[in-house]
Amino acid sequence: MMKMRWLSAAVMLTLYTSSSWAFSIDDVAKQAQSLAGKGYETPKSNLPSVFRDMKYADYQQIQFNHDKAYWNNLKTPFKLEFYHQGMYFDTPVKINEVTATAVKRIKYSPDYFTFGDVQHDKDTVKDLGFAGFKVLYPINSKDKNDEIVSMLGASYFRVIGAGQVYGLSARGLAIDTALPSGEEFPRFKEFWIERPKPTDKRLTIYALLDSPRATGAYKFVVMPGRDTVVDVQSKIYLRDKVGKLGVAPLTSMFLFGPNQPSPANNYRPELHDSNGLSIHAGNGEWIWRPLNNPKHLAVSSFSMENPQGFGLLQRGRDFSRFEDLDDRYDLRPSAWVTPKGEWGKGSVELVEIPTNDETNDNIVAYWTPDQLPEPGKEMNFKYTITFSRDEDKLHAPDNAWVQQTRRSTGDVKQSNLIRQPDGTIAFVVDFTGAEMKKLPEDTPVTAQTSIGDNGEIVESTVRYNPVTKGWRLVMRVKVKDAKKTTEMRAALVNADQTLSETWSYQLPANE
């Protein structure tokens, strides 16, 4: 077992019995800061090979017994269930309950689980420990508990609101994402969960993060609802210098969509957990970056000071856009990060990784500061993450947003009305918004467009779209070198008034 250099749960239980005591993020931060001053200890697995080597289908057979949910016998709307170790979830995490007077370790027992056809020796699993946990809450119906939070693996967590299904993930911290040196994945090694009162509508979770070059203390306040909001506070300490620190990272999947259609016939028009990165820059500009599944690793960086927000969104909720009855991509949430306070100078970065199927999370977005403190110095970040299906509500009524981006072979209509390809690529971008819908259809809306050195805009037209009551931009571009990426931007204006967010698109190389 890993040597623990801090107070054991038993000692903590003895110390924290005073009625004046209250557990806080500072208690976790003391441990994180202490860890940062010592060498990293690689977590050790105690998992028998029958569990470590199992296939996903076998792991799925291990189910938590719902009748034994933690807090099942308490008058609280929140319940806890736990994940068993198995496959690559092969390292135990400690989970503690925090009450008004004490901290209590929640001990693993195989009796919490049903194992299906998985053969195991009870004596070898009696002290295994949990892989993670999930939170249940009656979010859709008062008489049914639904899973709303899942914390499993590294520093990943997934959250949903009412009427949503799991999609993208959030993380505690990302280190050296997309760098040649390879990414480092910090992990939550211990959790403290406050026992909620019967009338509580929020749940507080603390976590201790550890990795070879960073440690951290986290406080998550989960507020379930139509939109489930997670209030996050983190105190981060570097053990050693890092190439890139990713704060408030989001991880998602994009396989194909109308801006990058499937290369093979597929009954599903789109397949993704998210289809764009939205940014509210410090200067007030809104940016929409449609996602791609590139043939080569792509990193986009948006420099700014004091970002107002960013997120990976799933725009377009019509079932007909996905046609998937099993995975219901139309119900998967968007995640929006709202910083608290000033985060200073840095960049919102988007990483797009090639993938051949939907089982790989190939999209990452995060904030990376320009300047990092010396190892051991504390960094503080506070923000909320909103998991929502109401993406249009992010924007003020007078700020139109991109409803969809479609890509097509560029062509020109001949005198005989036959369309003839002309070697260009056409982008069809529909804008809509609350105030835009009120504009007369003869409003002289135009587009401000630009393209990088690797392309040329051959034609750009804007016309009223009576179906969406918005405006459609059609832009035909010619790429100079197909082996290079091509950057382009566009926004709608009426005279000197900007009507929309900025559409910022990168045409991947070799497309």
Curated annotation (Swiss-Prot):
Involved in the biosynthesis of osmoregulated periplasmic glucans (OPGs). Keywords: Periplasm, Signal. HAMAP family: MdoG_OpgG. This is Glucans biosynthesis protein G. Pathway: Glycan metabolism; osmoregulated periplasmic glucan (OPG) biosynthesis. SUPFAM superfamilies: E set domains (SSF81296), Galactose mutarotase-like (SSF74650). One of its GO terms (molecular function) is catalytic activity. Contains a large N-terminal domain that would serve as the catalytic core subunit, and a smaller C-terminal domain that would act to modulate this enzymatic activity. InterPro entries: Gal_mutarotase_sf_dom (IPR011013), GH-type_carb-bd (IPR014718), Glucan_biosyn_MdoG/MdoD (IPR014438), Glucan_biosyn_MdoG_C (IPR007444), Ig-like_fold (IPR013783), Ig_E-set (IPR014756), MdoG_OpgG (IPR023704). Residues 1-22 form the signal peptide. It comes from Escherichia coli (strain K12). One of its GO terms (cellular component) is outer membrane-bounded periplasmic space. Belongs to the OpgD/OpgG family. Disulfide bonds: none annotated. The gene is mdoG. It is found in: Periplasm. GO terms for biological process: beta-glucan biosynthetic process.
